[in-house]
Structure formats: C-alpha cells, structure tokens
A protein has these predicted regions:
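Histidine-centered divalent metal-coordination motifs
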Residues: 36, 40
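Juxtamembrane/interface helices at transmembrane-helix boundaries
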Residues: 1-5
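Long, well-structured alpha-helical subdomains associated
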Residues: 78-107
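Post-HEXXH active-site segment of zinc metalloproteases
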Residues: 6-22, 27-32, 43-74, 82-88
Length: 107
C-alpha cells in the first residue's frame, strides 16, 4: 500500500493490482475504505488483473457489480450507507440515481 495525494479528484483510494493499493493520506486509518479496496484485490484474484480492468472499463454491469460488492463490504466495516450510495451513484458512470444505488447496497 502506498499513501499518496496523486489520485483522481474524487478518489480516496484506488486499487491498481492484486498487490498495490493507493490511499490518500487523509484516509490512512480508514479501515472501511481499506476493506473496500481489498475487495477489489479479491475480485482481481478471481478473474485476473487484466481481465478485471478490461471488464471494469468496458462493461457497465461488471463495474456496477464490482463496486456494489466492494461498497457492501465497506458498509459492513462501518461506512455510512448514505455516503456510499452517493459515491456509487455519482462517480462510476453507471447511470443510476441515489435511490437505486441505496437499494443496491441493502442486504
């Protein structure tokens, strides 16, 4: 894991590969965010890193599934569901509104 401020304007963390997570220093102790990013590492381990990134960037349904899984883990580690739904609805080019994102994040 590397702590860096060189992330996209909306990102607190970013999983590059199965072995590399970038976290903004302001979130260095955010265990819920780290659990979210580790979920992406597990997803990469399941399908392969290159396959993960190809599908994540080209397949909206795959991207949504990957983020919903990761946000559910983040919520289970104490993150606020409203906050996570806002991020899910607004930052992944999924074409969903807050209510839809919130519903996707319910158990």
């Amino acid at each position: 894991m590397i702590h860096t401020t060189r992330l996209l304007w909306f990102a607190a963390g970013f999983t590059v590969s199965q072995r590399l997570i970038l976290l903004h220093p302001a979130h260095a102790n955010d265990t819920a965010l780290l659990a979210h990013e580790r979920t992406h590492q597990e997803q990469m381990a399941r399908v392969g890193t290159l396959t993960f990134w190809w599908r994540y960037l080209t397949d909206k349904a795959f991207r949504q599934q990957a983020e919903v899984e990761a946000y559910k883990v983040q919520i289970a580690h104490g993150a606020n569901r409203d906050t996570c739904a806002g991020w899910l609805a607004g930052n992944y080019w999924l074409g969903i509104d807050f209510a839809t994102a919130y519903a996707l994040l319910q158990d």
